[in-house]
Amino acid sequence: MDILEIEQKETLSREEAAAKLKRFAEMLSKNNDLEFERGGMQIKVHVPDEVQLKVELELETDERELEIELTW
């Protein structure tokens, strides 16, 4: 059973998406925590020193999808 799941989808420019990914990378490298805000509530998740990284690329006829997943 999930304690909490946050999913957010939004349309961004390529540059805006890169900036958002960069912000996550900076949080991981500097603080060892990820911070999320949802409904006025701030959630902080500690990330250990070692994680598993999964990168998946799907090419379909009418759509492309890149998934980046960290698990620990």
Residues covered by each model-derived region:
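Short, structured protein-protein interaction patches enriched in aromatics and acidic/basic residues
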Residues: 8, 32-54
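C-terminal edge-of-domain segments
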Residues: 51-72
